[in-house]
């Protein structure tokens, strides 16, 4: 069993049209729009599709899976082969994809990235976290890092099952013990890192060594050696 993560920025050169036509959904072809936000989100979806294609190749799996993506009632994309799971996240101009391959058991993964920006962190923490976690947050020197750690890990575990941010407060986070508990995700482990241009949290439903990280750089994936991360046990 192996886990792969690729991330990239839509301002880097990339060509989805380099893929075989049958692997490109109609809704991912180029669009014309006057809305910069609509264009940005569309480009993020296009890059995510390309990153998933590249990860399938690296993993030695058939890229034909790209034409066999289904969606749950909540809209979460998945493959019919339960031993292979993937998840996508984007924030601003950044995109990340996680792909997990298991030999026999069912795979479940979730990923969340956030491009940092200043927010009312205290108000958001009061909305999603209990008093003990808020106290921990207020004692951290780097409030930006602390907030996105609390936020990203919640989203990542919930996205493994297709739950949205409405359940964020149902995730119990113990930062000192590096443990996470939730009724809305299976047992597993999670990594959080602030080493990249984005904050990133990734969940897998099994015990796994650090995923293989790749960065999209000038039309190809390049290996990224991650050195700084926090490992959590989940449930």
From Swiss-Prot:
Mg(2+) binds at residues 112, 114, 155. Keywords: Magnesium, Metal-binding, Transferase. One of its GO terms (cellular component) is cytosol. It comes from the Bacteria. One of its GO terms (molecular function) is holo-[acyl-carrier-protein] synthase activity. InterPro entries: 4-PPantetheinyl_Trfase_dom, 4-PPantetheinyl_Trfase_dom_sf, P-Pant_transferase_sf. May transfer the 4'-phosphopantetheine moiety from coenzyme A (CoA) to a serine residue of a carrier protein domain. This is Putative 4'-phosphopantetheinyl transferase HI_0152. It comes from Haemophilus influenzae (strain ATCC 51907 / DSM 11121 / KW20 / Rd). The lineage of its organism: Bacteria, Pseudomonadati, Pseudomonadota, Gammaproteobacteria, Pasteurellales.
